[in-house]
């Protein structure tokens, strides 16, 4: 119940910020690009961002050699977006956004996904869960994904991270069979809320 309250308060706070931004004057201009950054790269990464957060989001670009990143544009809100298209383990078109605090988790995910063997990837995740080295996402953070063969046919997918959550801790089902919001991967650092239609 406590975690549900945290999610509720987070969503309400975000709603208040959005409403407040809509009431004022025009939104501030987007932040400038970092030296050497391409506007096309920034624009592509931002496709996954909600319209109300897109203008001030940070945009990064992965460096696959070590999964560190370069900042293409430093935003003023907490959202960070990246174009993963064609990188190891990713769809030909793949963009995602989440909260800045999830960057260590994103980098760890990218490292894991470089292994083409699905069973080995899952074994690596299971081992990290067991030994405590799996980096947790921020509780209540939203992940926005858009993936597919190309932008025109890409599917949108939105999840809310609730690491460690179970039916006992949140009061939500651990299966989507009944319809409505449910917890996928309960009890793990990967636990997240699935929202039908998102």
Which residue stretches match the model-derived regions?
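Bacterial N-terminal signal peptides
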Residues: 7-16
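Primary mode marks residue(s) on the alpha4-beta5-alpha5 output face of response regulator receiver
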Residues: 24-198
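Boundary at the C-terminal end of the N-terminal hydrophobic targeting segment
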Residues: 18-22
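Positively charged n-region of N-terminal signal peptides that target proteins for export
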Residues: 1-4
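Generic detector of short, well-ordered, non-transmembrane alpha-helical segments enriched
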Residues: 16-17, 77
């Amino acid at each position: 119940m406590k975690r549900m309250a945290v999610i509720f308060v987070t969503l309400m706070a975000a709603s208040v910020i959005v409403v407040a931004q809509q009431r004022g004057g025009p939104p501030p201009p987007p932040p400038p690009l970092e030296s050497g950054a391409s506007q096309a790269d920034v624009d592509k990464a931002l496709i996954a961002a909600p319209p109300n957060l897109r203008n001030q989001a940070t945009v990064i670009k992965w460096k696959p050699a070590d999964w560190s990143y370069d900042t293409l544009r430093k935003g003023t809100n907490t959202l960070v977006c990246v174009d993963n298209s064609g990188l190891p383990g990713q769809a030909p078109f793949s963009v995602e956004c989440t909260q800045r605090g999830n960057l260590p988790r994103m980098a760890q995910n990218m490292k894991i996904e470089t292994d083409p063997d699905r069973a080995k990837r899952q074994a690596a995740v299971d081992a990290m869960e067991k030994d405590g080295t799996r980096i947790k996402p921020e509780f209540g953070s939203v992940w926005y994904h858009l993936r597919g063969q190309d932008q025109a046919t890409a599917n949108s997918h939105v999840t809310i991270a609730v690491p460690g959550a179970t039916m006992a801790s949140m009061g939500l089902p651990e299966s989507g069979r009944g319809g409505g919001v449910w917890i996928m991967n309960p009890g793990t650092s990967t636990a997240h809320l699935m929202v039908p239609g998102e």
